[in-house]
Amino acid sequence: MSPPLLKLGAVLSTMAMISNWMSQTLPSLVGLNTTRLSTPDTLTQISPKEGWQVYSSAQDPDGRCICTVVAPEQNLCSRDAKSRQLRQLLEKVQNMSQSIEVLNLRTQRDFQYVLKMETQMKGLKAKFRQIEDDRKTLMTKHFQELKEKMDELLPLIPVLEQYKTDAKLITQFKEEIRNLSAVLTGIQEEIGAYDYEELHQRVLSLETRLRDCMKKLTCGKLMKITGPVTVKTSGTRFGAWMTDPLASEKNNRVWYMDSYTNNKIVREYKSIADFVSGAESRTYNLPFKWAGTNHVVYNGSLYFNKYQSNIIIKYSFDMGRVLAQRSLEYAGFHNVYPYTWGGFSDIDLMADEIGLWAVYATNQNAGNIVISQLNQDTLEVMKSWSTGYPKRSAGESFMICGTLYVTNSHLTGAKVYYSYSTKTSTYEYTDIPFHNQYFHISMLDYNARDRALYAWNNGHQVLFNVTLFHIIKTEDDT
């Protein structure tokens, strides 16, 4: 392998790369995960001074990449001797705290006895003085009174004995606290720069760097499709549901369009949770009926094919009106060049990391698929690519990073069979199977924000995960 190629690293990333890393890798970072991975392909040290290391190409049994970060050897969060020592010290402190609480209650009780005894002793002292001053008149009743006073003082004896015991216990507590303080001081000095607060800051910093890295991994080649996850079961056999790939992180609205014809109603939900529960937030009545199920929401607007025409409509949800419409020249419509399942699926509108696209077929291209990149504002065709794949032989298709992926069927046993790169204007035949759980797919679209495939499968709204293959250049590579 040539030196320049040695500077290239291959990384497999799933649509849930960040969430998987946060849920699986951060626990290992702080010593809460002891899972052993297979030997990694590459080992890169992030910071020699810090001692952090990252495995960048380990694979789990499912073939997914797991970015594993190994903390320095002086990892305070691991279950080492220091952790056990701290737990033992904590138990001691808790036991001492309980004992001191009991001692405090007992002392308060005994103090009341002492106050009472003090009053009685003062009375006894006065009685002795009276006897001493009046020895001649000493009578039997004086001795009886003296005996009664002495009897009242008898309970003071066990109280004073308890005070002596408590005094010893307090002395013992003082010694234990002194030893505990010395141990904690030693641990604090040993911890030094590797305290929990700094470790927490390092984790946050590493998370930020990983997110920055993720932004650079927006494009890649499709390697695998996993799932599906069934989100909801609703509607007819055919329809579309989608989210906006350009929406902010806080904007998780879902749009729902049931059926492939004779409908103008779009239902909006504020979140996936509301969609699942059926809590609509708004309903839109479009000015035109749509054709097919291959609509797309992009940057706050709905793009759809007008019924019985090759006209594309741009409808703004915020403004509630049509912003643009344009005929897609030579594009077949009304089941002239649909996908294998029919349903007026002649014109497929889609979006990816690069922009807005239209996939269709023309007589000029012998019914084979044509890919056109559209201007999202004017709907003008900016550039087109003619492929050799018959549109009527395709089950569905979707765009990822400027590459069109075509399935060979909408039924059971479907797989991604063909791909065409608009970057290189080349095609290849592929073999990427996926699970058609409900036997009839009428909508399959990629969402670049979620890095997932949204599908309508025989009245079920489902999601597929995608695994992409990336080539990453090092900073030194020019």
Curated annotation (Swiss-Prot):
<dbReference type="InterPro" id="IPR050605">
    <property type="entry name" value="Olfactomedin-like_domain"/>
</dbReference>
<feature type="signal peptide">
    <location>
        <begin position="1"/>
        <end position="23"/>
    </location>
</feature>
<feature type="disulfide bond">
    <location>
        <begin position="219"/>
        <end position="401"/>
    </location>
</feature>
<feature type="domain" description="Olfactomedin-like">
    <location>
        <begin position="218"/>
        <end position="470"/>
    </location>
</feature>
<dbReference type="GO" id="GO:0005615">
    <property type="term" value="C:extracellular space"/>
</dbReference>
<keyword id="KW-0175">Coiled coil</keyword>
<feature type="glycosylation site" description="N-linked (GlcNAc...) asparagine">
    <location>
        <position position="95"/>
    </location>
</feature>
<dbReference type="GO" id="GO:0007165">
    <property type="term" value="P:signal transduction"/>
</dbReference>
<feature type="glycosylation site" description="N-linked (GlcNAc...) asparagine">
    <location>
        <position position="465"/>
    </location>
</feature>
<dbReference type="GO" id="GO:0045202">
    <property type="term" value="C:synapse"/>
</dbReference>
<feature type="coiled-coil region">
    <location>
        <begin position="77"/>
        <end position="217"/>
    </location>
</feature>
<dbReference type="Pfam" id="PF12308">
    <property type="entry name" value="Noelin-1"/>
</dbReference>
<keyword id="KW-0964">Secreted</keyword>
<protein>
    <recommendedName>
        <fullName>Noelin-3</fullName>
    </recommendedName>
</protein>
<comment type="subunit">
    <text>Peripherally associated with AMPAR complex. AMPAR complex consists of an inner core made of 4 pore-forming GluA/GRIA proteins (GRIA1, GRIA2, GRIA3 and GRIA4) and 4 major auxiliary subunits arranged in a twofold symmetry. One of the two pairs of distinct binding sites is occupied either by CNIH2, CNIH3 or CACNG2, CACNG3. The other harbors CACNG2, CACNG3, CACNG4, CACNG8 or GSG1L. This inner core of AMPAR complex is complemented by outer core constituents binding directly to the GluA/GRIA proteins at sites distinct from the interaction sites of the inner core constituents.</text>
</comment>
<keyword id="KW-1015">Disulfide bond</keyword>
<dbReference type="InterPro" id="IPR022082">
    <property type="entry name" value="Noelin_dom"/>
</dbReference>
<dbReference type="GO" id="GO:0032281">
    <property type="term" value="C:AMPA glutamate receptor complex"/>
</dbReference>
<feature type="glycosylation site" description="N-linked (GlcNAc...) asparagine">
    <location>
        <position position="33"/>
    </location>
</feature>
<dbReference type="GO" id="GO:0042462">
    <property type="term" value="P:eye photoreceptor cell development"/>
</dbReference>
<feature type="glycosylation site" description="N-linked (GlcNAc...) asparagine">
    <location>
        <position position="179"/>
    </location>
</feature>
<dbReference type="InterPro" id="IPR003112">
    <property type="entry name" value="Olfac-like_dom"/>
</dbReference>
<dbReference type="GO" id="GO:0005794">
    <property type="term" value="C:Golgi apparatus"/>
</dbReference>
<keyword id="KW-0732">Signal</keyword>
<dbReference type="Pfam" id="PF02191">
    <property type="entry name" value="OLF"/>
</dbReference>
<dbReference type="InterPro" id="IPR011044">
    <property type="entry name" value="Quino_amine_DH_bsu"/>
</dbReference>
<keyword id="KW-0770">Synapse</keyword>
<keyword id="KW-0325">Glycoprotein</keyword>
<feature type="glycosylation site" description="N-linked (GlcNAc...) asparagine">
    <location>
        <position position="299"/>
    </location>
</feature>
